[in-house]
Amino acid sequence: MKPPTNRRHKAREWALQMIVQADLNPFAKPEMILAHFWEQQWSCRQEAAGKEDDDLDEMERALQPGERLASTGVREFTEQLVRGTLAQLDALDAQLVPFCEHWSFDRLGVIERCVLRLAAYEIRTLKTPAPVVINEAIELAKYFSNEEAGAFVNGVLDRFVRG
């Protein structure tokens, strides 16, 4: 079962943050990044709510941080995006490089590079409709970087899809 669209957007947002962490920490294993991310997100949510772990009921304490934050479908989709993208980094980069006109892939900003990888994985491997993925990628690039990043990502992914 697929989570609703707004939840899929949140899953992509979380996945991008973890993929950026992997890009910045290339020796970190995906499972460590996932565990750390979920724990950090849970801690931030608890702090914002003014709660301590002692305030949790017994059932909540039995859950892992990721289980407390998101439904099973959202969490599974997020983790599928992260694991899949990280497992295919070299192949995704090789597929994207020809479409980064006038840019060396290594010289792209970390956000732009990771957004492109995530989108390419979702288009090619998960077969999500390209217009949906491109729109999401543009929004993520604009949110985590700037308007120009959104335009750049749009151009690269448009060429990538037309291939």
Residue ranges and their predicted role:
Residues 1-163:
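N-terminal interaction/assembly modules
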